[in-house]
Amino acid sequence: MTPLARFRKVVVGGTFDRLHLGHQRLLSVALELGDRVVIGVTTDSFVREEGKKGVEPFEERVRAVRRFVEEKGASDRVEIVPLEDRYGTTLEDDEMDAIVVSPETEPVALEINELRRKRGFPPLSIVVIPFVLDGDGRKISSSRLRGEVDEGPCRDD
């Protein structure tokens, strides 16, 4: 068991586009809390269904997540899975006991728990991680980063 682990199996999911400090915080907490961690990364088709534009390809996002997990020395206890919908494997895996989310995705975790109850699975403990803010007090987000990359910094040289 890892020193800070409180749960046997933790799940966390997301698009993880342009892996930023907010993602890293979410993943770090999941790694701290779980003996085993399932990380769901949204597939390209799910990203399209959600109407997101300019998102890095699935394999690139998985590589970034895998690299982060390796840097944390946690590869041996992490499973990275494709996320085809909002629920991933949370409605099928009765060994999961916690889910790590942002305030933005907390409603999905509540929905997951309701669906788990209906299937006879125990609800997941929901761990909500506050947003990481930039120097201006704004939420760090992939959509903002995509916008800044698309527009680029304006410089008069």
Swiss-Prot record:
It comes from the Archaea. It catalyses: (R)-4'-phosphopantetheine + ATP + H(+) = 3'-dephospho-CoA + diphosphate. GO terms for cellular component: cytoplasm. Pathway: Cofactor biosynthesis; coenzyme A biosynthesis. Transmembrane segments: none annotated. Its EC number is 2.7.7.3. Its main location: cytoplasm. The keyword Transferase applies. GO terms for molecular function: ATP binding; pantetheine-phosphate adenylyltransferase activity. GO terms for biological process: coenzyme A biosynthetic process. It is found in: Cytoplasm. Coiled coil: none annotated. Keywords: ATP-binding, Coenzyme A biosynthesis, Cytoplasm, Nucleotide-binding, Nucleotidyltransferase, Transferase. Belongs to the eukaryotic CoaD family. Reversibly transfers an adenylyl group from ATP to 4'-phosphopantetheine, yielding dephospho-CoA (dPCoA) and pyrophosphate. PANTHER family: FAD SYNTHASE. This is Phosphopantetheine adenylyltransferase. It comes from Methanopyrus kandleri (strain AV19 / DSM 6324 / JCM 9639 / NBRC 100938). The gene is coaD.
